[in-house]
Amino acid sequence: MTIFRRTPAGLVASGVFMLGLYAAGAVAYGQPVTNQRVMLINAQTGKCLTIAGGRSTDNNVTALQFDCDGDPSRSWSINATSGGVYQISNAQTGKCLTIAGGRSTDNNVEALQYNCDSDPSRTWRITATGGGVYQISNVQTGKCLTIAGGRSTDNNVTALQYNCDSDPSRTWRIRPAGQ
C-alpha cells in the first residue's frame, strides 16, 4: 500500500501548476467562462460558432460554423442573467444568440442573432458534460445548440437546435478568444 503525503514542496508545485493553467487561459470544468470573450467550438467538428458574413448587425442573421481564427465574429461574450442562465452575444455584432421564431420546440430550427432583450429565447443554460465540453440549451425551447448534420467539417454549415442527447455534435468547448 502506498501512502501519499502532502509535503510543502508538493503543495507549492501543485499551486504553481494550477496558477500556470489559469494564466494560460485554461477553462475550469463545470463553469463556463464569463466576463471575457470566448470561442464556442463544436466538439464534433472542431469549428467555431460565428454569424453568417461576420459583420451584419441585422436581426435574423444565421449562426453557423467556420474555421477558428482571429476574426472577431468568432468571439462571443457569455453574460450571466440569473439562476444559471446566460445570454450569449456575438463580439462583432453585439447581437444575442437565439432560435428562429423563439418558440418552436421542433428539431432543426436555425440558430441566429437577434437584439439582446429579456425574451427567454435569447437565454441559454450551459451544462458541463465532462471532459471540458458543455451542452448549450435554449431556455425557451429546451433544445441543444448543434451543427446541421452533426458531422461536416465544412465552413458555413448552419447551427440549429436539436434534442439534447449524448451526440458529441451537441457539445461545445469554450475557450478564451485568441487561444
What does each model-found stretch correspond to?
Residues 30-179:
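Lectin-like carbohydrate-binding module/patch detector with strong preference for beta-trefoil
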Residues 1-34:
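N-terminal prepro-regions of secreted/extracellular proteins
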